């Protein structure tokens, strides 16, 4: 439906239809592998497949440029508080919908910025971090509060609700959306060799450096020359 609206030049309608089922098309429009395009039935009629990924991105950029996207805080709050643990894609989606329903939402994350693997696992050439920041600013303007550098001991053997409330305070409900920040190791020959590293570790480190986060080190050497 949103592709049809786009075809007819109705950009704002396309935006409304698209975001009715996807809160963050500006993310999926950049990083989705677009597997659906390979199965598009238009190819059976000598046409090119629909460019869903590029269309999503174009619709959202037009929406930002034309100010279709503006802060829309809920008119009425329910009086209920929800804590979302994890500011990755799942946590952000949960926070977005809960806030729209009128809940008071607090998002907690161990990192210094929101986004999870969107920020720390995907290179800038695929997803510029300004795109993430733009969305986070909108969510803040709608009343969602973000708390960074907060580690919740969910993996502890002695984990309890008392520990959870001690770490982030008492809420009416909790959404655990910590995601998968750890890479899946491979049990293959040569994995134990020196110099063989997991790609996710490398991507995370590189993205953190680009964000201005220096890795822990006792000594820092700076070389300058002409």
Regions found by a protein language model. Name each.
Residues 20, 24, 38-42, 120:
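General structural signal for alpha-helix termini and helix-helix connectors
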Residues 27-33, 109, 137:
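Short, compositionally biased low-complexity segments
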Residues 33-46, 146, 170-177:
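Hydrophobic or amphipathic alpha-helical targeting/insertion segments
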């Amino acid at each position: 439906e949103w592709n049809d609206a786009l075809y007819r030049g109705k950009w704002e309608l396309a935006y409304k239809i698209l975001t009715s089922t996807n809160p963050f098309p500006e993310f999926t429009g950049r990083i989705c592998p677009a597997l659906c395009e390979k199965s598009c039935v238009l190819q059976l009629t000598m046409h090119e497949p629909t460019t869903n990924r590029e269309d999503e991105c174009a619709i959202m950029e037009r929406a930002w440029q034309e100010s279709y996207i503006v802060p829309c805080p809920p008119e009425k709050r329910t009086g209920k508080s929800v804590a979302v643990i994890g500011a990755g894609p799942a946590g952000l989606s949960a926070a977005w919908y809960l806030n729209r329903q009128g809940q008071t939402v607090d998002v907690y994350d161990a990192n210094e910025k929101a986004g999870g693997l969107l920020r720390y696992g995907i290179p800038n050439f695929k997803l510029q971090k300004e795109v993430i920041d733009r969305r986070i600013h909108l969510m803040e303007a709608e009343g969602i509060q973000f708390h960074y550098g907060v580690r919740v001991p969910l993996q502890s053997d002695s984990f309890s609700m008392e520990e959870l409330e001690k770490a982030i305070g008492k809420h009416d409900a909790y959404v655990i959306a910590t995601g998968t920040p750890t890479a899946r190791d491979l049990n293959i020959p040569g994995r134990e060799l020196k110099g063989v590293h997991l790609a996710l570790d490398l991507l995370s480190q590189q993205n953190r450096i680009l964000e201005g986060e220096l890795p822990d080190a006792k000594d820092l050497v700076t070389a300058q020359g002409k």
